[in-house]
Design a protein with these regions (language model features):
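Short amphipathic alpha-helix that is part of the acyltransferase structural core
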Residues: 2-39
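C-terminal "cap" of GNAT-fold acetyltransferases
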Residues: 17-18, 109-154
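Conserved acetyl-CoA pyrophosphate-binding loop and the N-cap/start of the following alpha-helix
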Residues: 86, 90-98
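Conserved beta-strand in the GNAT
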Residues: 54, 60-69, 73-76, 81
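A short helix-loop-beta-strand connector motif used in the catalytic cores of GNAT acetyltransferases and
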Residues: 44-54, 111-113
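Residue-level recognition of the GNAT/N-acetyltransferase active site
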Residues: 83, 87, 120
Length: 154
C-alpha cells in the first residue's frame, strides 16, 4: 500500500483512503461528541497524517481513522471514529485492520515498528481483540499525556 487513493468495498461499506475532507472530519468528530476543533486545526491534522481512511455506507460517511507518526519506527492510530448508528457492525474492525496493514507495508525488512494508540475508557477489549496490549506491562511503563495551551503573552 502506498499513499494513494484507494477503495475497498466489504458488506456494503466502502473504504476510501486519503480522501477525508475537513468538513467530514469535523462532522464525524461532532457525532461522537469529541472535542471541537477549529477548521485550521482539522486541516493541519489531516495534512500531517500518514494516511486517513473514511468508511461510507450508501455514500454517507459513517466512520474514519487517521494515522500519524514517522512511518519507520512508530505509527500511531490517532483517530478511530464510528458514528453511533452503525457501531457494532464491524466497521471499526475493518478500519483498524486496514490501518494495521498500512503500517505493516511501511516496515523495512529485518526491522519492526510500534503501532500505538490511546483508547477511550471502556474500549480496551476492542483493541485487545486486534492484538494491542494495555500498558503498563512488566516491561513498558504507562502511557502519558500533557495538554498544551496557547502561550499567553505578558
Amino acid at each position: 500500500m502506498n499513499r494513494r487513493e484507494d477503495m475497498m468495498e466489504v458488506d456494503m461499506i466502502q473504504i476510501k483512503d486519503n480522501q477525508l475532507d475537513v468538513q467530514t472530519y469535523l462532522s464525524l468528530r461532532e457525532k461522537v461528541n469529541w472535542k471541537k476543533l477549529s477548521e485550521e486545526q482539522a486541516r493541519k491534522a489531516l495534512e500531517n497524517s500518514l494516511i486517513t481512511i473514511c468508511a461510507f455506507q450508501e455514500e454517507q460517511p459513517v466512520g474514519m481513522a487517521r494515522m500519524v507518526g514517522d512511518g519507520a519506527v512508530i505509527c500511531y492510530v490517532q483517530d478511530l471514529i464510528i458514528i453511533p448508528e452503525v457501531q457494532g457492525q464491524g466497521i471499526g474492525s475493518m478500519l483498524l485492520e486496514y490501518m494495521k496493514r498500512y503500517a505493516q507495508s511501511l516496515i523495512e525488512p529485518g526491522t519492526q515498528m510500534m503501532l500505538d494508540l490511546m483508547c477511550a475508557k471502556g474500549r480496551e477489549s476492542f483493541y485487545e481483540k486486534h492484538g494491542f496490549i494495555a500498558r503498563p506491562t512488566e516491561n513498558l511503563g504507562p502511557g502519558m499525556i500533557c495538554y498544551l495551551k496557547e502561550k499567553q503573552e505578558g
